[in-house]
Each structure stands twice: as structure tokens, then as C-alpha cells.
From Swiss-Prot:
GO molecular function, one term: rRNA binding
PROSITE patterns xrefs: RIBOSOMAL_L24
Subunit and partners: Part of the 50S ribosomal subunit.
Protein name per UniProt: Large ribosomal subunit protein uL24
Family statement: Belongs to the universal ribosomal protein uL24 family.
Matches recorded under Pfam families: KOW, ribosomal_L24
Length: 106
């Protein structure tokens, strides 16, 4: 299974494709497919038939997954998309650090 560099809840910036430059929160991570779903990015329209849960039916807009290589973590301190550096603390915990400013990313 490929390793994905982002986690659910991270703020990311899309770096390529039709939504390049947009920021959003990661809603879902699919490590088996190496894809992520980002809030407000890669919106697609799906035609839905009426069901008991949705009696109206019609055209529904939703976020579609994008490849994880097309997003970068976004650092709020330096306000840039950034790569990360991993550091092991004395107690054994790992933390992710912004390559630009050295700030710890949650």
C-alpha cells in the first residue's frame, strides 16, 4: 500500500490541474488508491435517480478524489504550500515540520 503524505483534516493546496491554487481541508484519504478528497476542490456533477431518501432526484454536485501527488500541505504561518520534514522527539513521538519556516504542522 502506497504511503500518503497528508492526513484527514490537513489544510492542503492543489498544485496541478483545473483547481490549481485552491486551498481546502482533506475530507477523506484513500491510501489503497493513493487519492484524497479535498473540501471544495474537483467538484463533479452526478445525475441521481429519485430514491426514498432523496425523492427529488436531479443533478448533485460533490467532491471527487484527486491523486495525492497533486496536493501539498499548506503552512498557515508562512502562508505557502510546503514540503515537510519529519522529526522524532525524545519521547518517541513524530512531528511534521514545515521546510520553509520550521513551524510544527499539526
Amino acid at each position: 500500500m502506497p504511503k500518503v503524505h497528508v492526513r484527514k483534516g490537513d489544510t492542503v493546496m492543489v498544485i496541478t490541474g483545473k483547481d490549481a491554487g485552491k486551498k481546502g481541508k482533506v475530507v477523506t484519504v484513500e491510501p489503497a488508491k493513493n487519492r484524497v478528497i479535498v473540501e471544495g476542490v474537483n467538484i463533479v456533477k452526478r445525475h441521481r435517480k429519485a430514491t426514498p431518501q432523496m425523492p427529488q432526484g436531479g443533478i448533485v454536485e460533490k467532491e471527487a478524489p484527486i491523486h495525492s501527488s497533486n496536493v501539498m500541505l499548506f503552512c498557515n504561518k508562512c502562508n505557502k504550500a510546503t514540503r515537510i520534514q519529519k522529526k522524532v522527539l525524545d519521547n518517541g513521538n513524530k512531528e511534521r515540520i514545515c521546510k520553509h519556516c520550521g513551524e510544527t504542522l499539526s
